């Protein structure tokens, strides 16, 4: 495939506005492209207009199965007038292709698809199966990753590469993430007679104080050598009706980034114990809800998959971790374990930013590197 066509494919999928939805249009485009080159795909519907894409091909004797995965959704562009170049125009300036999803992660997804096409048409021998898993809803809960895992689509994998941006680093571990809500129920009263009511904001403040103390203690006591410490932040709070009334309803939301050494179930139990303790007070009525629960993940940094990748470079690539989550948080819940790594084009600090871009030489190089990795792993 010519260089210009590889770039044009990336431009086409960036121009599809798959903002927290509409992934079906991306899936249909990629499925048609793959079928044009003899690779048959399957659309797996999540909801109306939202389709995952599974595609695979095999060569030689039935050997190992190597998965390639990327998500098709992107986050909102924000204030589009703040962009130097329109976020869905996919303009090229110098060596940079600009657009929402250029780095996170349509360049990684396109590179994987093109690598499969070129490898199939090259006739180069290998033994095994290459399997694409293009997912919906990664940005808002790894929805497609969860769906495909529960449906058994990763049960045959021996290894998996997720093409999120890592800029020539190998991400083998990342933090988990928990979003929670605490609702405080109380009793309204006039602000001149606070003893006639139950001030729910004071109650939330007490929860924040206790939660911060417990989480700070946890962070100081347990640390992961790569990921660091557990991170806790209360990020949203709302309540009250007017300034001269004691509020009867308020709520807060918080986010926790977890590490393998103190997993999510223990953190959730800790939050529950704080709420239970406070609710022993006669005027307290706190209600805890876990809104989002993604586990931390860790792969073997000395796995055959990582060795195959390292062999494609003259200098060893750094092994890293990240605070952000990926579809690995769902895929690794499969009934069997498999090697995985996050490795794709783009700078890790650019996702969700204004003027997001990918370096074209990085994108084009990853197409070649993915092919070399496949041939090595499935030799």
Question: What does each model-identified segment do?
Answer:
Residues 224, 287-379:
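An extended, acidic, His-containing surface patch that forms the Zn2+-binding/catalytic region
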Residues 63-131, 360:
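Active-site metal-coordination/substrate-binding segment of hydrolases
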Residues 1-77, 249-253, 360-362:
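N-terminal helical capping/dimerization or prosegment-like subdomains
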Residues 145-280, 289, 294:
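Midchain, well-structured core segments that form catalytic/ion-binding scaffolds
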Residues 9-12, 16, 29, 33-37, ...:
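Generic non-transmembrane alpha-helical segments
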Residues 105-175, 179, 379:
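Acidic/histidine-rich catalytic neighborhood of metal-dependent amide-processing enzymes
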